[in-house]
């Protein structure tokens, strides 16, 4: 199958605020990203440990013809939690209903979803850590006993009735597993942490996506896109589409190493995979706060970004690459960060720079 972006109306897309953000795109960009998602484990790349476990658990559930145990997927944004949930439903041969924690404001919102599930269906709740306490309370008996208690009527005439549900599988996704309440976390029988992808894994993803987009690309060009994608498939696919645009206008349509380098330089994505926001973050820590330790709120105010975005989107990759440390006293830039910006570490302080 070849995906043509002409199939999607892109005329009123809002401008991207940050190319390397792994946050979900606009609905129309999301439509293209959905078309690039693998549908089966056979097409799925990376997350070897989580994939192997899920394949075994799904195979066992299919063999016994019962609902898969509830699944919690957690990790930084853009690593494929939603994609995995679709694959789980597809491999189980059942339907999937999708929602998110903030959308489920009242118990009746969740009850409407649960009562419409068919036997062994999958219910996917993104940002499950943002469920309200009152909705979460309704979810507990549904997860354990496939039953919910709902109130009928109001005032003195109100009464509670118990409804039986079809067996189902809840797949919860979160970037902040630590914010889940213990009672909710304990009700997941399968917990999988998604890790950043290697450049080699991302190169395979980029190659597959280029084929679906009918975008000619050599191996070197694909690998250059992959290694600058912050270990994140969503970013890799987003960069691929922008590099393809550059190749069509400034080249002969083929994504080569030279085309990839020039396109990514135009997008301000450096060889380390950092963009302007990453460099702005490191510059704030090093130049404004003497390398740290500095609190998150101070950094957020300094660079004009929300604390939650910094924690979820910017910091994980910087920490994973060894450019930043989180300590009890605050954030500290590492020697690698100083070298990357071409700034000399404070004289006489290099040895103590990274003490916690």
From Swiss-Prot:
Residues 13-197 are annotated as: Large ATPase domain (RuvB-L). One of its GO terms (molecular function) is ATP binding. ATP binds at residues 36-37, 78, 81-83, 144-146, 187, 197, 234. Residues 198-268 are annotated as: Small ATPAse domain (RuvB-S). Its main location: cytoplasm. GO terms for biological process: DNA recombination; DNA repair. DNA binds at residues 326, 331. It is found in: Cytoplasm. Keywords: ATP-binding, Cytoplasm, DNA damage, DNA recombination, DNA repair, DNA-binding, Hydrolase, Nucleotide-binding. The RuvA-RuvB-RuvC complex processes Holliday junction (HJ) DNA during genetic recombination and DNA repair, while the RuvA-RuvB complex plays an important role in the rescue of blocked DNA replication forks via replication fork reversal (RFR). RuvA specifically binds to HJ cruciform DNA, conferring on it an open structure. The RuvB hexamer acts as an ATP-dependent pump, pulling dsDNA into and through the RuvAB complex. RuvB forms 2 homohexamers on either side of HJ DNA bound by 1 or 2 RuvA tetramers; 4 subunits per hexamer contact DNA at a time. Belongs to the RuvB family. Has 3 domains, the large (RuvB-L) and small ATPase (RuvB-S) domains and the C-terminal head (RuvB-H) domain. The head domain binds DNA, while the ATPase domains jointly bind ATP, ADP or are empty depending on the state of the subunit in the translocation cycle. During a single DNA translocation step the structure of each domain remains the same, but their relative positions change. Homohexamer. Forms an RuvA(8)-RuvB(12)-Holliday junction (HJ) complex. HJ DNA is sandwiched between 2 RuvA tetramers; dsDNA enters through RuvA and exits via RuvB. An RuvB hexamer assembles on each DNA strand where it exits the tetramer. Each RuvB hexamer is contacted by two RuvA subunits (via domain III) on 2 adjacent RuvB subunits; this complex drives branch migration. In the full resolvosome a probable DNA-RuvA(4)-RuvB(12)-RuvC(2) complex forms which resolves the HJ. This is Holliday junction branch migration complex subunit RuvB. It comes from Polaromonas naphthalenivorans (strain CJ2). The gene is ruvB.
């Amino acid at each position: 199958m070849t995906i043509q972006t002409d199939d999607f109306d892109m005329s009123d897309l809002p401008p991207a605020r940050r190319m390397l953000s792994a946050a979900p795109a606009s609905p129309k960009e999301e439509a293209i990203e959905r078309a690039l998602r693998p549908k089966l484990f056979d097409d799925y790349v990376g997350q070897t440990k989580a994939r192997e476990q899920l394949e075994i658990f799904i195979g066992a559930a299919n063999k016994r013809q019962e609902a898969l145990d509830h699944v919690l997927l957690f990790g930084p944004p853009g690593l494929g939690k939603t994609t995995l949930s679709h694959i789980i439903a597809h491999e189980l041969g059942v339907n999937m209903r999708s929602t998110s924690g903030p959308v489920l404001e009242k118990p009746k919102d969740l009850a409407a979803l649960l009562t419409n599930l068919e036997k062994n269906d999958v219910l996917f709740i993104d940002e499950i850590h943002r469920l309200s306490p009152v909705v979460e309370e309704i979810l507990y008996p549904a997860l354990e006993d496939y039953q919910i208690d709902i109130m009928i009527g109001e005032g003195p005439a109100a009464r509670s009735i118990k409804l039986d549900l079809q067996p189902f599988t809840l797949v919860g996704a979160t970037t902040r597993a630590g914010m889940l309440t213990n009672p909710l976390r304990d009700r997941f029988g399968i917990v999988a942490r998604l890790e950043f992808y290697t450049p080699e894994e991302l190169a395979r993803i980029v190659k597959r996506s280029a084929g679906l987009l009918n975008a000619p690309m050599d191996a070197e060009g694909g690998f250059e896109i992959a290694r600058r994608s912050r270990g994140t498939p969503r970013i890799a696919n987003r960069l691929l589409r922008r590099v393809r645009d550059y190749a069509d206008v400034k080249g002969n349509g083929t994504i080569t190493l030279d085309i990839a380098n020039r396109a990514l330089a135009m997008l301000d994505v450096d060889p380390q995979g950092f963009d302007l926001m990453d460099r702005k973050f490191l510059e704030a820590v090093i130049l404004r706060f003497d390398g740290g330790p500095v609190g998150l709120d101070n950094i957020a105010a300094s660079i004009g970004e929300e604390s939650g975005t910094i924690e979820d989107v910017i910091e994980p990759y910087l920490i994973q690459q060894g450019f930043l440390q989180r300590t009890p006293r605050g954030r500290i830039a590492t020697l690698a960060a100083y070298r990357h910006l071409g700034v000399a570490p404070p004289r006489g302080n290099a040895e103590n720079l990274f003490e916690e």
